């Protein structure tokens, strides 16, 4: 009986790393000269999976976004985990931007990924299971080709390859 190998493609986020990145943002902004004497806030709402940033101007808000993305990348998280929802005026001449935290693969994108895997013409199967995709195959080399191909393509969700068995 031949051994079958598999792995999962998902968009899970290491929430501890995410929280660490947000804490590092607070520390860096508190020490930056260009933010001295201005109002700013970076608030992570865990229940709603939202990140809310408030700054005194659009320039400060852009700088805050750049700092957040830099810290996420240093924690090995993709910048795609944040999806900008809306930018609006806040109290006291402040600007506010809300980001939704993306930790799932949408069904349309999951279908596209499964179709791409099928188009590779390898002896592997891709099965959509909720918010992840299980890829099975008899050869490890085929699975590694699938991973390399999917990684090389541009996707909306921050894809993670896990549970290689």
Curated annotation (Swiss-Prot):
InterPro entries the UniProt entry points to: DUF520, UPF0234-like_C, UPF0234_N, YajQ-like_sf
A GO term from the CC aspect: cytosol
Domain of life: Bacteria
Any one Gene Ontology molecular-function term assigned to this protein's record: nucleotide binding
SUPFAM superfamilies given in the database record: YajQ-like
Pfam families associated with the record: DUF520
Keyword field: Nucleotide-binding
CDD domains per the UniProt record, alphabetical: YajQ_like (cd11740)
Family indicated by similarity: Belongs to the YajQ family.
Record's function text: Nucleotide-binding protein.
PANTHER family, per database record: UPF0234 PROTEIN YAJQ
Protein name as it appears in the record: Nucleotide-binding protein Suden_0039
């Amino acid at each position: 009986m031949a051994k079958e190998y598999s792995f999962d493609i998902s968009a899970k986020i290491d929430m501890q790393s995410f929280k660490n990145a947000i804490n590092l943002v607070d520390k860096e902004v508190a020490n930056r000269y260009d933010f001295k004497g201005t109002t700013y806030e970076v608030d992570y709402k865990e229940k709603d999976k939202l990140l809310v940033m408030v700054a005194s101007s659009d320039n400060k808000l852009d700088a805050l976004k750049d700092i957040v993305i830099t810290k996420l990348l240093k924690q090995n998280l993709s910048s795609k985990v944040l999806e900008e929802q809306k930018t609006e005026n806040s109290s006291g001449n402040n600007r506010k931007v809300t980001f939704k935290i993306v930790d799932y693969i949408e069904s349309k994108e999951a279908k596209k990924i499964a179709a791409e895997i099928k188009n590779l013409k390898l002896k592997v199967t891709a099965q959509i299971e909720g918010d992840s995709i299980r890829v099975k195959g008899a050869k490890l080399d085929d699975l590694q080709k699938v991973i390399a191909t999917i990684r090389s393509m541009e996707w909306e969700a921050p894809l993670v390859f896990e549970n290689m068995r």
